[in-house]
C-alpha cells in the first residue's frame, strides 16, 4: 500500500466496492504450499514460516522521507519479527537509511518497489521499470533484504498468461543482481488467488507460466477483498487456491478497514494456521486510520515519540 494507496488507491478500492464490487484486499515466513484438487481442496500442510510475522511501513510521503520509525516501541513488542518497507522509486537515498536502520534493530526486511500512481496497472512496462529499478539500485540499498518486486501490479482482469509473461521478463532482469527469493504480489490488488495459481502451475494447454521457482506469492487481505475470478468476496478457500500453485505463500498486507464483505480476520487466521507469514498494515504510514502507533506520520511527519494507537491490537493480536 502507500499513503496514496490509503488515500488515493484505498479510495479507488472503495469506489470499486461501490461501483463494481471490486476493492483492494494482502511478507514472509513462508509455507511450501501443496497441490490442491479443484473440486474439493485438500488441507494445506502446516510448516513453520521461514520469516517471522510482522508489519508494514510506508515512510516515503512524510517528512521528506525521513520520519522517525519509533524503533524502541517496536522492539518492545516482540511478536514483530519482519518489516515490509514500501519504497517510492524516487526515494532511493532515504530507503538506504530505512533499510540500514531496520538491520541495526535486528529485523528481517522485505523491501517493496511501490509506485502509487500505477497500482493495479496491467501495463507490463511498469513492471519492467520496477525490475530495472532493482537492477540499478539493489546494491546501493545495501542488500540483506528480500525483494518484493512491485506492489500490487496487475488488475482483477489480467489473464494468467499475461501475468506470467510480464513477471518472467521482470524476474529475469532482477536476477542479474539478486539470487534470493522474489515476492510476487498476486493480481487484483492482491486478491486474484486463482489467477496467480494458474500463472504458476498452468491451467490451460500451452499457457505461459512463471518459470522461476524461487518466488513467494503474496496476497493482501482487507474487509473489501474481492475475487473477481470467482465472482465473490474472498474467503478461506482462496488460501487453498493460492497454495495449489506449489510455491510458498504469504499474507503481505492485512487490516480491518476498506469496504466489507470478506471475513478478513478469519482469512488471516486460516493462512497463519497453514504456516504462512502474515504482515499487518501498518506500523505507520497509512493515510487513514490503520496505523498501529500515534501520532501517525500523516498527522505529524516530524514526530519523535510514539505510543500505541487504538488500532494497535487489531494487528498485533494476529501476529
Question: Which residues make up each language-model segment?
Answer:
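An active-site-proximal structural segment forming one wall of the substrate-binding cleft
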Residues: 67-80, 87-114, 119-149, 161-175
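Hydrophobic alpha-helical targeting segments used for export or membrane insertion
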Residues: 19-27
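Bacterial N-terminal signal peptides that target proteins for export
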Residues: 3-20
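Glycine-centered signal
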Residues: 2, 12, 28-32
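N-terminal pre-catalytic segment of deacetylase/amide-hydrolase enzymes
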Residues: 41-85
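Bacterial Sec-dependent N-terminal signal peptides
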Residues: 26-48
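Extracellular glycoside hydrolase catalytic/binding regions
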Residues: 52-59, 64, 72, 125-144, ...
Amino acid at each position: 500500500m502507500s499513503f496514496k494507496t490509503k488515500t488515493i488507491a484505498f479510495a479507488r478500492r472503495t469506489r470499486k466496492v461501490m461501483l463494481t464490487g471490486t476493492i483492494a484486499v494482502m511478507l514472509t515466513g513462508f509455507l511450501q504450499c501443496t497441490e490442491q484438487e479443484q473440486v474439493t481442496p485438500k488441507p494445506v500442510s502446516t510448516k513453520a514460516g521461514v520469516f517471522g510475522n510482522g508489519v508494514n511501513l510506508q515512510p516515503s510521503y512524510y517528512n521528506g522521507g525521513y520520519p522517525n520509525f519509533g524503533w524502541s516501541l517496536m522492539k518492545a513488542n516482540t511478536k514483530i519479527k519482519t518489516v515490509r518497507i514500501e519504497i517510492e522509486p524516487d526515494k532511493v537515498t532515504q530507503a538506504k537509511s530505512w533499510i540500514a536502520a531496520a538491520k541495526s534493530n535486528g529485523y528481517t526486511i522485505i523491501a517493496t518497489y511501490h509506485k502509487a500512481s500505477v497500482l493495479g496497472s496491467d501495463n507490463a512496462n511498469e513492471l519492467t521499470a520496477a525490475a530495472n529499478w532493482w537492477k540499478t539500485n539493489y546494491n546501493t540499498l545495501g542488500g540483506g533484504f528480500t525483494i518484493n518486486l512491485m506492489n500490487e501490479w496487475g488488475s482483477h482482469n489480467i489473464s494468467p498468461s499475461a501475468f506470467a509473461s510480464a513477471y518472467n521478463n521482470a524476474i529475469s532482469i532482477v536476477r542479474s543482481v539478486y539470487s534470493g527469493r522474489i515476492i510476487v504480489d498476486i493480481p487484483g490488488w492482491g486478491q486474484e488467488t486463482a489467477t496467480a495459481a494458474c500463472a504458476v502451475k498452468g491451467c490451460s494447454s500451452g499457457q505461459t507460466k512463471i518459470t522461476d521457482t524461487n518466488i513467494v506469492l503474496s496476497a493482501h487481505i482487507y474487509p473489501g477483498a474481492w475475487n473477481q475470478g470467482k465472482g465473490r468476496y474472498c474467503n478461506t478457500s482462496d488460501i487453498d487456491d493460492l497454495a495449489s500453485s506449489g510455491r510458498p505463500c504469504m499474507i503481505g498486507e492485512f487490516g480491518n478497514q476498506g469496504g466489507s464483505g470478506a471475513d478478513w480476520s478469519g482469512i488471516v487466521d486460516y493462512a497463519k494456521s497453514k504456516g504462512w507469514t502474515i504482515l499487518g498494515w501498518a506500523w505507520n504510514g497509512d493515510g487513514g486510520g490503520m496505523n498501529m502507533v500515534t501520532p501517525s506520520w500523516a498527522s505529524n511527519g516530524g514526530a519523535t515519540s510514539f505510543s500505541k494507537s487504538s488500532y494497535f491490537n487489531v494487528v498485533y493480536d494476529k501476529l
